[in-house]
Amino acid sequence: MTMTMTQQMITIAMVVLGTMLTRFLPFMIFPSGKPTPKYVQYLGKVLPSAVIGLLVIYCLKDVSLLSGSHGIPELVGAAAVVLLHLWKKNMLLSIAGGTVVYMVLVQLVF
């Protein structure tokens, strides 16, 4: 299905509007002169850990301990993330390192 030029322009305008709205809305709602509300500060503290926990559970939900590789690559990859983070305290390094360990195990070992 092809779109007419008008439909294409409307689609592009809506995407631009949506992108700009999500970028600028926080600055309009919370101007720099006012203090940030306590609930927003609270969410800023608890949401990162909650999101990471949710992602870990989502990634491990289909791991079968009774078949295939018995979840060994996932366990070793998760352990690599934990150990790298305890050692270097760098989230990007931890996630990237755990991903590399997991992919090497899945592609070359199991």
UniProtKB/Swiss-Prot annotation:
What role is this protein assigned?
Involved in branched-chain amino acid transport.
Q: What is its main location?
A: membrane
This protein's GO cellular component annotations are: plasma membrane
Which terms does the UniProt entry file under GO BP? Answer: amino acid transport
What species does this protein belong to? Bacillus subtilis (strain 168)
Mind telling me what this protein is named? Branched-chain amino acid transport protein AzlD
The gene for this chain is azlD
Its keywords, alphabetically, are: Amino-acid transport, Cell membrane, Membrane, Transmembrane, Transmembrane helix, Transport
Keyword Transmembrane helix part of the UniProt annotation: yes
Keyword Membrane on entry: yes
Identify the InterPro entries for this entry.
Brnchd-chn_aa_trnsp_AzlD
Compartment list: Cell membrane
Quote the Pfam families the UniProt record gives: AzlD
Protein's membrane topology: Multi-pass membrane protein
Q: Which family does it belong to?
A: Belongs to the AzlD/HI_1737/HP1330 family.
Q: Transmembrane stretches, by residue range?
A: 10-30, 46-66
